[in-house]
Amino acid sequence: MDIRDRILEAAKRVYAQHGFRGATTRLIAIEADVNEVTLFRTFGSKAALFEALMAAHNAQTPIPPLPEESADPVREMTDWVRRVLAHLRENRALIRTSVGEAEERPGAAVTMCEGPTCAGRILSDYMRRLQAQGLADRDVDVDTVRAMLMSAMFGDAICRDMMDRVFPEPESEAAAKYVGIVVRALGIDRARPVHLARSAAGD
């Protein structure tokens, strides 16, 4: 790992623990095992370092795709939710800190949520394709279903360890349980073969 990446990783850990004000360049330099001169030569300022940190976070955010033509909506959504949840849980501390400082540093919170926001658009588009393919009820309000699922995932990832017996158990089955509710909300008939639903939609 080169010096720049090492400093960014250190800044991520220190920021998650101490917030922007508490994440001094001295603490970050110690965590990265470099001196402050090296830190400033690399980034120029603390503000520039944190801009780079947020940009790096977004660049590294895995936003899983959903298929253009669905073969198995339940499996596809369950896999997708599982991957998004894993990313949110992995970055729980960083997200909490950014949201907690939203009043003081709104730009950082918005940047931190760009990945989930993009994921929400991908999910909405997928649900509309399910409607067009005859796999979901055309009258369902997709945006509301998407908002409910994204909110559930965000709350689960950020608050599960603080709110006992509030979220689906066991944790490993949460994705499947959330999707089970979404499937019913969308009016997806699990028992109906996909090719028959598509044929009916084309009539």
For each feature predicted by the language model, list its residue ranges.
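Basic, helix-initiating cap at the start of DNA-binding domains
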Residues: 1-18, 22-37, 41, 48
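Amphipathic alpha-helical interaction segments
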Residues: 6, 48, 79, 97, ...
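Conserved hydrophobic residue
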Residues: 20-21, 108, 136
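Amphipathic alpha-helical linker/stalk segments
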Residues: 51-80
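Helical hydrophobic small-molecule/effector-binding pocket
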Residues: 55, 77-100, 104, 109-110, ...
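Short, hydrophobic secondary-structure boundary micro-motifs
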Residues: 62-66, 96-98, 109-112, 139, ...
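Amphipathic alpha-helical packing segments from all-alpha helical-bundle domains
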Residues: 86, 90, 107-133, 143-147, ...
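C-terminal effector-binding regulatory domain of bacterial HTH transcription factors
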Residues: 186-203
